Amino acid sequence: MSRAMDITRIPGSAIGAVVAGADFSGTIDDTQVEEIWQALDQHLVLVFRGHKDPSNDDLLMFARRFGHVPKTGLTTGASPDHNEILLISNILDENGQKIGVGNAEWMDWHTDYSFRPRVSRIGFLAAVELPPSGGGQTLFTDMYTAYESLPDDLRQRLHSYRARHSLRSGYEDVIEEEYQGEVSIEGPTAKPFVAPEDGTATVHQLIARNPRTGRRAVYANPLNTKRILELDVTSSKEVLQQLFAKPGEPELTYAHEWLPGDIVMWDQLGTVHAKRAFDPTERRLLRKVVTIFDDPAEPWHPEDAA
């Protein structure tokens, strides 16, 4: 039987809780899984501390209790023996090649896999090596409350909009005809523009719905959301800029100061995250795993706003 956990809200923070006593050995039971789900539903970001550092196998086994873990598909930047694990690092190997992805600079607000048909449901980051002088904090913003705080008329309109997400820059300027008839996940003859685990661009509704809680979130981020299809270019930019002003608002945001051994788990559907810069002469390494929705349509519901 898994040992008891202690879950404590992070004082003074808009979101987030610290979880002590979690079992990463692969023996986590169904009761503890549901307890973690409920804590995630409430706090959106969970910081696990006071546990034995899990092996790659144990980390993956733990993550799989919360959904399907896809391979990264990368030939560089992933763990050599576990392609599902992305290495977030500025470290160079003996040949001067990066061992992972990322750098020491600011990483803009985003949510993982928004540019793929099967978006990420949960993210996990495990600290391995941290810059001694600090920096590199990971920031999380609550996009459920961001949605709920919008003016009623705007919130209603957002439910009729779809947005294009892309890993490629400049793609928002493609002619309108190319947008039409691209990604569709409806109907027996639907043909996705990209494969579920191999894509770099797709289209999603602008409002997502958490299948466990029913809460709705703005599903847009400055890094990957390029265009609202139903609006002209100017109007699309105006609406997106209004939405992009939400990430980082203090009353919606938690800034995680990393400690050795920390594992952070977060709701990818209802949050966006970013990374602060750190000294590029110092080393930083984290292991990253995500889960994705089994059904690509699960987070997207056409019903009107409540």
UniProtKB/Swiss-Prot annotation:
Cystine bridges: none
Record text on cofactor binding = Binds 1 Fe(2+) ion per subunit.
Q: Does the keyword Iron apply?
A: yes
Q: What is the lineage of its organism?
A: Bacteria, Bacillati, Actinomycetota, Actinomycetes, Kitasatosporales
Q: Which reaction does it catalyse?
A: pentalenolactone D + 2 2-oxoglutarate + 2 O2 = pentalenolactone F + 2 succinate + 2 CO2 + H2O
The UniProt gene name for this protein comes to ptlD
**Annotated function:** Catalyzes the Fe(2+) and alpha-ketoglutarate-dependent oxidation of pentalenolactone D to pentalenolactone F. Also able to catalyze the oxidation of pentalenolactone D to pentalenolactone E. In presence of neopentalenolactone D, mediates production of PL308 and possibly neopentalenolactone E.
Binding positions (2-oxoglutarate): 138, 258, 284
Miscellaneous: S.avermitilis does not produce pentalenolactone itself in vivo but instead a group of new metabolites that are neopentalenolactone derivatives.
Instruction: Indicate the family of this protein.
Output: Belongs to the TfdA dioxygenase family.
Designated name of the protein = Pentalenolactone F synthase
Pathway noted in the entry: Antibiotic biosynthesis; neopentalenolactone biosynthesis
Record carries keyword Lipoprotein: no
